[in-house]
Each structure stands twice: as C-alpha cells, then as structure tokens.
UniProtKB/Swiss-Prot annotation:
Signal peptide: none annotated. This is Putative E3 ubiquitin-protein ligase XBAT34. It comes from Arabidopsis thaliana. No E3 ubiquitin-protein ligase activity observed when associated with the E2 enzyme UBC8 in vitro. SUPFAM superfamilies: Ankyrin repeat (SSF48403), RING/U-box (SSF57850). InterPro entries: Ankyrin_rpt (IPR002110), Ankyrin_rpt-contain_sf (IPR036770), Znf_RING (IPR001841), Znf_RING/FYVE/PHD (IPR013083). GO terms for biological process: protein ubiquitination. PANTHER family: ANKYRIN REPEAT DOMAIN-CONTAINING PROTEIN 39, ANKYRIN REPEAT DOMAIN-CONTAINING PROTEIN 39-RELATED. Its EC number is 2.3.2.27. ANK repeats lie at residues 41-71, 77-106. It catalyses: S-ubiquitinyl-[E2 ubiquitin-conjugating enzyme]-L-cysteine + [acceptor protein]-L-lysine = [E2 ubiquitin-conjugating enzyme]-L-cysteine + N(6)-ubiquitinyl-[acceptor protein]-L-lysine. Pathway: Protein modification; protein ubiquitination. Keywords: ANK repeat, Metal-binding, Repeat, Transferase, Ubl conjugation pathway, Zinc, Zinc-finger. A zinc finger (RING-type) spans 325-364. The gene is XBAT34.
Amino acid sequence: MGQQQSQSKDEMLFQEVSNNNVEGIKSLHHEGAGLEGVDKLGRTPLILACTNDDLYDVAKTLLELGSNVNAYRSGCNGGTPLHHAAKRGLVHTVKLLLSHGANPLVLDDDVKTALEVARDEGYSNVVRAIESHICLFSGCMREYSGSSLLNLFAPQLLSRKVWVVVVPTGSRNPTKPLKLELVLYDSIQDAQPRMVIPLWKANLEEPKSFRCDDSVMIIDDSRSPKSMRQRRESGFISQARRWAQVDRQIRLKLAAEIKGDMKQMNWFSEACKGVPQPMNPPRFMKTSQATTTTTNVPALSDDALTRVAMSLPSPKTANKEDGLCVICVDAPSEAVCVPCGHVAGCISCLKEIENKKMGCPVCRANIDQVIKLYHV
C-alpha cells in the first residue's frame, strides 16, 4: 500500500511539473515524492521541465531540491537534461543546467554531445553558451589563404576574419584523457562550423618568433595513411601523387585578429596544447568543484583537464642555458622585466612589448619598466 501511495505521489509530481506548479512540487517532495522517477517515455521530472521554455522556474526548483542534473534517458531522442534543452534551443535552461554542474561532454545514444545537438539544430545562442563554458580558447582570428609571398605584402587581401574555439570532445569513458578539437566558424553568428580539426591527430607549427611571423599553421594528419602497408605503398607513389596527397590534408593558417597581438596568439597556441590560462580557466572547472549533487555521470574536474595536457605534446620552452632572447631567438637575453623579474629577452624586443602593453612573454604580468643587465 505504501509503495502504491509513493508511486501515486511520483505521478502527481509529473502532473505538477506539466502544470508549472512550483509550490505543488515543493509540497509533494516534502511529503516524500521522489525526484528521479520516470514516466512512460523514460523522462525524469527534470528532463520533462527541460523540454519547455515556460518550465524554467520548475527546472530551477527541481535542481534546488536535489534533482540529478545528469540523469540519462536512453533512446534516439534521449540524453541528459542538457541534451533535451539544447535540442529545443532553450538557452536560459542550458545556462541554468551548466551552472548547476551539468556535464557537457556526455554522449547520447546517437554519440553526440549537447553541443553537437545544438549545432545540428542551428541554435547559435546555445552553441555559444556551451562553448564559452568549456572552451580553452575562443575568439576572432584571421584565416590566411594563398601564397606566403602575397601574405607578406598584402595580408589584408588574403585573410578573412573567422570565429575559432578550442573545446574538449565527448567520450564514453570519462576516465580516459580528454581530447581537444579546433572548431572554425565563418562568423560568431553561425551555429554549424565550417571546419573541425581533431587536435590529437594534428600538428601545430609555430614560428620561432611571433615578432617575425604572427601566424600558426595547423595540419590535420587524420587523413594520412595509417597502416604499415599503406605507409610502404606511399613510398612508391609518384611525386605528383605525393603532392596531391598533401593537398588533401587540411592545412589551416591562423593569425591574431589584431596584427601583432602576441597575447592572443600565445593563448591560442597554449590552448591547442591543452594548457588552460591560469587567469581564465574554462568555467566548467569551477562549477565542477562547487557541485555537490550526486550524479550518474562524473562531473568534470581539474584532474580531467590535467589529463588533457598530459595527453598532448608539451609546449616548447626556451632553453634557459642558451641565453638567447625568447622572442627573436637571435640577440642575447640581456634585459629584465619589472616587477616580475624575468630575464626574458633582448632590450629591443622587450621595449617593443612594453610599448604595446603586451605583458611579460614568460608570465604575462604587466611590465612597468625594462632594465638592461650588464655582466661584470
């Protein structure tokens, strides 16, 4: 009898959710109604609330009462509450779920994250909301095309502004290191990207000095021959076919939106290597620490992002023993940044950085003064 009464209260809770009755939901929960029951369609009360924009207050109430923010519904139109809200373009509900610790990297039965669902449905506002929550980098950059010689003398004619983000991908196994992908949109208003490059299969070619060349080349090697037999056969192809094979690779050349913006280029390069910026880490790292709700899917943590950096090539650092400027890699390192105290480069390079207010090339701290050092 008690079980039948409990089930009846659970059914009444679904009715109150549909009726947008916040007080009725609180009353039933106080009387013992469960928050994780499922209806005939396999939906929890929170999933049901995340299918209608008018039920935002209901979703907020259920989360405050302790509903599982990552409850999973199986099926072709299933997933977590975040999947359901993203599929319907409910941007306010999406932000609410993310603020309560929703895991944006969970895959549904169609092997899609909520971000990919929002892209497919064309909801650019939802795409931006999720990307801003999980990205290691986002910003407007310049995409180069054409020959290097023309890029040198007329870059404005051969470059166009694009919106670029670096985000982690979804995985069935949350214990494995996260993988990153570079996503390129023609504009910030677009929901569907023009290009997606898996960074774990790509090569990042950086110039020795951003002072001489302010661009970065990303080469996608995912289409390269993988098997040993393919590698052996590739050694016998003609030179013409070899060039054709190279042309099929995705080669993306990007530069900062504002020419000479070393801070943006360093941020982008570090993000591609899986290194978050200490002053601006992805917001999902913060929410995962603040979330105490018990969930079926593990929330993201600092350890997860640490595994990203460990699974990617470590950033190249200047050899401190060679005594060369880390910027031009030519002149001796003879000047110190004040107040941070880093001996980071030659006097001319550091003076230029100081004038442009770019910050110390080592720690990004503001430079109040550059002092030349003399060896006695």
